[in-house]
Amino acid sequence: AALQVLSAPNLLRVGSNENIFVESQDHVGGPLNVKIMVKNHPTQSKELASKSVVLDQANNFQAMTQLVIQRGPLVDDPKQKQYVVLQAQFPDRLLEKVVLVSFQSGYIFIQTDKTIYTPASTVHYRVFSMTPGLEPLTREIFEDQEVAKNKEIAVSVEIMTPENITIFREIVNPDKGVKSGQFKLPDIVSFGTWHVVTRFQSTPQKTFSSEFEVKEYVLPSFEVSLTPAKAFFYVDDNDLTVDITARYLYGKEVTGTGYVVFGVITTESEKKSFPASLQRVEIKDGKGVACLKKEHITQTFPKIHDLVKQSIFVSVSVLTEGGGEMVEAEKRGIQIVTSPYSILFKRTPKYFKPGMPFDVSVYITNPDNSPAIGVEVEVTPDHAKGVTRANGFAKIPLNTVASATELVITVKTKDPGDPRQQTGGGTMKALPYRTSTKNFLHVGVDSNELKIGDPIKIDLNLGPTTIPNHDLTYMFLSRGQLVKVGRFKRQGNALVTLSVPVSKELLPSFRIVAYYHVGAADLVADSVWVDIKVSCMGSLKVTSTRPKASYEPRRAFSLTITGDPGAKVGLVAVDKGVYVLNSKHRLTQTKIWDTIEKHDTGCTAGGGADNMGVFYDAGLVFETNTAKGTGIRTDPSCPVSSRRRRAVTISDVITSMASKYHGLAKECCVDGMRDNTMGYTCDRRAQYISDGDVCVQAFLVCCTEMASKKIESKQDALLLSRSEEDDDDDAYMRSEDIVSRSQFPESWMWEDTNLPECPAQNKHCESTSVIRNNFLKDSITTWQITAISLSKTHGICVADPFEMIVLKEFFIDLKLPYSAVRNEQLEVKAILHNYSEDPIIVRVELMENGEVCSSASKKGKYRQEVNMDPMSTRVVPYVIIPMKLGLHSIEVKASVKNSGSNDGVKRDLRVVAEGVLVKKETNVLLNPVKHGGEQTSHIPSGVPRNQVPNSDADTLISVTAGEQTSVLVEQAISGDSLGSLIVQPVGCGEQNMIYMTLPVIATHYLDNTKKWEDIGLDKRNTAIKYINIGYQRQLAYRKEDGSYAAWVSRQSSTWLTAYVVKVFAMSSTLISVQENVLCTAVKWLILNTQQPDGIFNEFAPVIHAEMTGNVRGSDNDASMTAFVLIAMQEASSVCEQSVNSLPGSMAKAVAYLEKRLPHLTNPYAVAMTSYALANAGKLNKETLLKFASPQLDHWPVPGGYQYTLEATSYALLALVKVKAFEEAGPIVRWLNKQKKVGGGYGSTQSTIMVFQAVAEYWSHVKDLKDFDLNINLEVAGRASVTKWSINNKNQFHTRTDKVNSIDKDLTVKASGNGEATLSVVTLYYALPEEKDSDCESFDLSVTLTKMDKTSHEDAKESFMLTIEVLYKNSERDATMSILDIGLLTGFIVDTDDLNQLSKGRERYIEKFEMDKVLSERGSLILYLDKVSHKLEDRISFKIHRVQEVGVLQPAAVSVYEYYNQKRCVKFYHPQREGGTLSRLCLGDVCTCAEESCSMQKKGEPDVQRIDKACGAGLDYVYKATVVDSKLTTHTDTYTVKIDLVIKPGTDEGVEGKNRDFMGLAYCREALGLMQGKTYMIMGKSEDLHRVEDKGLLQYKYVLGEQTWIEYWPSQQECTSRDYREVCLGIDEFINQITTFGCPV
């Protein structure tokens, strides 16, 4: 017999192309016309899609056709599942299935140009929008023109802060599925993880998001990677080694020091270090090795077995050789194990076919969840063996016994490299496939992992069967869609082999389902799940057109992009340093497939418990004309366990350290006799000895009795420094000819390109190419170029990143902090790299910037000359003070002597105000319904007192609609108990109605609340059948006049007739109810039972009084009238036309009840009357609520619990009718808690009324979700009001506003219906709290003392540098710390002193860097094993001046713990206290004065006066008298009276007025200004500064290096011989300037 089949995915997507399959297997005869339809569920009142197909010989009586399900009446409510009815109308029968639907329109993937951003930078994003079939979402892909025309393809893009405030939103229309956009981050932002949230405009409830990080950072110049020797630590292991690799981003190896610590991450995700594991590792040529020993663990955790299943982390901080930079890395997931492997039966079916092969597919992982490769596996019962492949899988076929009732599989692993024989095991149980005919089918695939283009060899083993020839159908499913189907006829053979190539549609994995049928009832099926190697459906590759090992900055290059013809390709080039900081948020092909695989409808590895289980587990609905069909899927997602992922974080704080020394007492004595430069007592020195009492005693005895002898050593000076012009200028390239590198984008090449279609002569080409020409940026790094394509035929493809190394043989790496605080001194480092094979001499120049005080200020540049070894790195430090807010460039140029090699770097330093970013958040819940329909909220600004003056501040405002509406929607009563109400009506006219009520109210309730799945979606057809039976049976008790009684012979009952009207009116939407049947009953009630005053009387009470509720109780006149009136009201929509007297009759009844209501005493009658009046629009809510319980949640009726239920239900209906949902909520909650009896509520009336009331409530609150919320935002000082309107269509979009200040009061007014949250986030800079120092962790003091005599043969002067450091912690000493000591230019360090400090028992420093002559370093690095927290540690050594330098810049000393790079910095200088650069300050406005002193001119010839007064840049010439002076340790201020303006300058009208002139304290002697004396002062415009003081603009004069100061003798002095010539010269000069001006 033929088998007719309807099959489709068991989760259908609305609005997308879906493949539906129909066939007739073993069909004999002519063509078949089949109509496929999709209708709404449960009523099937609307057709949502349809298509007709013809099954014939040509298509093998099979057809797979595409349908697009229209949205129609479907509502995408996340809390409510939606179903459709899928039908296939064959000529002789209808096949139908209820199918769950999804509103997933497709996929959106988001690429950002980077993974991490700084404030004020620009985020570039690219949106890729696709259909579920991975085609670009365009209108062209839909066959149906009407569908295509109406298809919404727009995508909304939102940028959300870590507080989930949307601060940017736009709607984009992707072109060919791709659209780029950008967003500039504000200057003041919240740090943390931000989100790009996208959604299809057609289904805004479904979001797709991508993340990026925002923080303040500087890109590192090298990366550190950690490779453990093993992925686990076995409890019996003695050690674990970790290889450290440090490599510059441009590929060269790093030399330096690594600080390593190991620890464990506990089960509570808490990190605990092993203090004993702290170690310093030498990194040479980019490599180092760290070692964790078992005793390191057991010193902290004696019972190592307690740590099993917890994971070890290793944290490494690598400091470059010259101390120029430190980079951190961490490796996690090294599990402590008793067995090294985990065994998962990941793709092994749960069911086997007795007597047929069974494929065991095991996945073996290391403890870090990575695949374990090459592990030997043994499987019992067969003792079959296998070995895991590169993906960690091993596939082992087992033979099964035909009589087996279960299959217990045990897998054991063996590690040949491990002496412990057995390393792990796992067990699973498989059950037999259920079949009534003993027919089986086994589908086997030869490979565990395939790639596109590979042939799949599919073995179909049918085993012994009595039917020799029959059709066998196979289907391929991937990504939740039917992809291809086929069929062949079996010709008696038991094994059939198919070979099908793997096509792109099957990525990333697919299922093969095969089946045949035996006779009418048995269908035999099997399936298998097959994984495909992660790859693109098509191809995309980026290569260099002319490949090279490395490229130079700014040079031209050419890329070839090859991929799928016609694809759109998005490009971006990213500095590899970005991924060193954050590689988490990159869009990769694996991430894409992971997302898509989540939407796979199949849930198991293959097979099934029985034939329909095979289809269901594979993700299919399957219905046939003979065999039973699949169950109905009710959950869109599979019950899968989540995959654990490895996380990477920065190093955590190390809390303690341990350091032990061993030595002989004799050595201790020798050490005690050594000289000590710190001047410590013997007792204090002995505190540094940790060799035990024996050593301490020996040390003290020798120290106190012996004198020491100084040992001096010689050291050559190679550091040469000049600030003046060099004699050998010709040997260097002029700095003006060096063009500095200044373009250092972290990403660029953000562009889209289209690959050409195939050429006409080769229309089926596999790929096409395009060439892009460009110029490299200025960075020395590795650029990673990522390309992502989207093709209409091959979907989305992320190419492997293409790397371009950019490098020069000699270059500068200028290290600047992310930001610097205005007026705070800091050190920046220029790192010189020499990658040539020769030693070089380099001239380095710091260029002047007027806004930054440095040694280059007022001189144009500051020069140094340094020697460099081959293949070496050199640090040149500079001390600067930024003077103004904003971005200011720091430029360093360098050229190699007698060579063309040179480089220049110009980077911007961000100068910020003093202050800390503060964030304050306020949330206001807007729910106007709870505030009488209108809500007003005031949010005062409250300007903080500590805000930094004139600094940026922002207020971000956002409004997000709540998921719920203003009313808390109560859950409907669970439908699971209603199954027992679906019964077949029987009995007399009254009993029949009792029973008919049950399926009617169950169907009414489950239809309204969409809860059919609680009792079974297929039960609705049964319920409808029973309602029809009840209806037909009741007609037998209908009298000719339309009335009803228990028997036709009995007198008609008013109540029963009214009840029939009520139930039939309710049924009329479910079955066909004749209008005259309903309306003649209504007419009978009006004509025969209603009295002139409107009351309805009962003349023949029903026999089954229990079915009427409390209608016969007190106030029964009102109860009966209300009951009949309600029945009429419910039937009025059907009967108004045919029963003319109906409106008048209802009006009379309403009038009677209105009059009667105030006098009623029975709560039951009040509730029922209230509902009848509510239907007429005349509810008196006050009266109704008066009879409620104190909690206002139910209406107690004396005499029966069922009456209370019924009365409460009528009250609920009345309140719902007038939309009083606030009051209705507690009532539903109360009803929900009441105990049901057999699915109902004890009596007919209480059951029908409770379910009717709750259904009515639910259907109304559903409509409440139509938001209608209006919000007005008023900002103080802003003329316009911002207005937002939230409705159902736009409720998922966030509204935002921004106020560029924090001193504006906000007023929010909300009206209408709905709930929303208003969030206000205020960001501003607060003044830091007063503190003596920025040093949070250390106290540091640096003093430089000149020695009486030199102690080095080349020294011009010798100094003792003393550094005292204390760790500011009350509990512990600092662990391994680094003291970075900058050296003054022209000075060398005394290495004998350093050797003494670092050797012997009493080591004050653990190590110092002296691989080369020390003066070749920019700084001296001292490594300290600890820093005391009780007593200041002192380190003293001599430094010698061996070279005279024109301008000597201060040097910096910094100290920090290796894991916390927040440094404590102090400066030193031979002449300046605190080593500060020279500045002159008035209030908070400062001027750089880093220059030589001006000398008072004495007896200068006239010509020099004229030259000076008329020279370039000279501003003024004054005769001035000093009237006052204020002298301080740093700045001297002279108040002078301007007696005569000889040459006027910028400062107008100054004659006769006082002005302040400022000079440096150490220039006091050179200036020689005395109070009461008069001077000629000439100054340049650059020494004149305009400042605001108390609101007044005034000029401040600086006595700088270029200022002319000459004593002006008094009249009396001019008569003396000493001054006569000077006075004549001055008179001549004044005459020349005032009469003739300056010579041209």
From Swiss-Prot:
Cystine pairs: C536-C797, C603-C638, C668-C695, C669-C702, C682-C703, C853-C1488, C1079-C1135, C1335-C1464, C1481-C1486, C1493-C1563, C1510-C1638, C1614-C1623
Domain NTR residue range list: 1493-1638
Tell me what gene encodes this: c3
Report the locations given in the UniProt record: Secreted
Gene3D superfamilies, alphabetized: 1.50.10.20, 2.20.130.20, 2.40.50.120, 2.60.120.1540, 2.60.40.1930, 2.60.40.1940, 6.20.50.160, Alpha-macroglobulin, receptor-binding domain (2.60.40.690)
Question: Would you tell me the Gene Ontology cellular component terms?
Answer: extracellular space
Q: Which PROSITE patterns match?
A: ALPHA_2_MACROGLOBULIN, ANAPHYLATOXIN_1, ANAPHYLATOXIN_2, NTR
- Segments forming domain Anaphylatoxin-like: 668-703
Briefly state the modifications made to the protein after translation. Answer: C3 precursor is first processed by the removal of 4 Arg residues, forming two chains, beta and alpha, linked by a disulfide bond. During activation of the complement systems, the alpha chain is cleaved into C3a and C3b by the C3 convertase: C3b stays linked to the beta chain, while C3a is released in the plasma. The alpha chain is cleaved by the serine protease complement C2b component of the C3 convertase to generate C3a and C3b following activation by the classical, lectin and GZMK complement systems. Phosphorylated by FAM20C in the extracellular medium.
Q: Where is this region: Properdin-binding?
A: 1420-1430
Single annotated GO MF? endopeptidase inhibitor activity
Q: How does it assemble?
A: In absence of complement activation, the C3 precursor is first processed by the removal of 4 Arg residues, forming two chains, beta and alpha, linked by a disulfide bond.
Which residues does the annotation list for site: Cleavage?
R722, S723, H931, G932, R1278, A1279, R1295, T1296
Instruction: Tell me which Gene Ontology terms the entry assigns under biological process.
Output: complement activation, alternative pathway; complement activation, classical pathway; defense response to bacterium; inflammatory response
Q: Which domain of life is it from?
A: Eukaryota
Record: glycosylation sites: N164
In its UniProt entry, what is this protein called? Answer: Complement C3
Q: Where is this cross-link: Isoglutamyl cysteine thioester (Cys-Gln)?
A: C988-Q991
Cited CDD domains:
ANATO (cd00017), complement_C3_C4_C5 (cd02896), NTR_complement_C3 (cd03583)
Query: What is the documented function of this protein?
Result: Precursor of non-enzymatic components of the classical, alternative, lectin and GZMK complement pathways, which consist in a cascade of proteins that leads to phagocytosis and breakdown of pathogens and signaling that strengthens the adaptive immune system.
PANTHER family in the cross-refs: COMPLEMENT C3, MACROGLOBULIN / COMPLEMENT
Q: Name one Pfam family in it.
A: NTR
Q: Which InterPro entries match?
A: A-macroglobulin_rcpt-bd (IPR009048), A-macroglobulin_rcpt-bd_sf (IPR036595), A2M/Complement_sys (IPR050473), A2M_N_BRD (IPR011625), Alpha-macroglob_thiol-ester_cl (IPR047565), Alpha-macroglobulin_TED (IPR011626), Anaphylatoxin/fibulin (IPR000020), Anaphylatoxin_comp_syst (IPR018081)
**Could you tell me the keywords of this UniProt record?**
Cleavage on pair of basic residues, Complement alternate pathway, Complement pathway, Disulfide bond, Glycoprotein, Immunity, Inflammatory response, Innate immunity, Secreted, Thioester bond
